[in-house]
Amino acid sequence: MSKNINKTNTHLEEALSDFISKISDDSNKNTDLIAKKFLTQLEKKFNFQKKDIASIFSHLEGVNHNHPIYINKIPFISFCEHSMFPFFGEVSIAVLPDKNILGVSKFSDLVNNLSSKLTLQEKLTEEIGEKILQYLEPQGTYIKVKAKHLCSDLLSPENSIGDITTTYANGIYELDSSLRAEAALNMS
């Protein structure tokens, strides 16, 4: 199995190196090293997701807190499952706890974990909310993801668009429009 992976990586490096040579003005560049470095960094990003999501939520604390908690502007980068181009931006999370809270850095860990794969912004937004609901068991969550998609800029610059915003609500945030409005206000 390891030999097949190494062989595949070698083929990818060679193909990418050839591609870089064709699109580069500088024939003196060491395209083999550039290709290898690019693929190594890409592999690191995708391997980050291997972390078990349940381990992110292993340090729950019993708490008597019945007011919303807002975690704003967690940066992320992911890759579109349609085009493989990156999209990047910020995730904001509103959680109305029930019995448990989570350390603030754990929300960032969750976002990094779930964004380390080919996905769609809409799927990422929902998946973040669903995982928090599943593991933290809050009264509800409201998720806002604002991102820039490079596919629109690179594939069709004349039709380039600004940021795309997606939202997702579950639990009490799905039922109570005033809580959603409060969350949206705290995320701006």
Predicted regions located by residue number:
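A domain-level signal for the structural core that forms small-molecule/cofactor-binding pockets
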Residues: 1-188
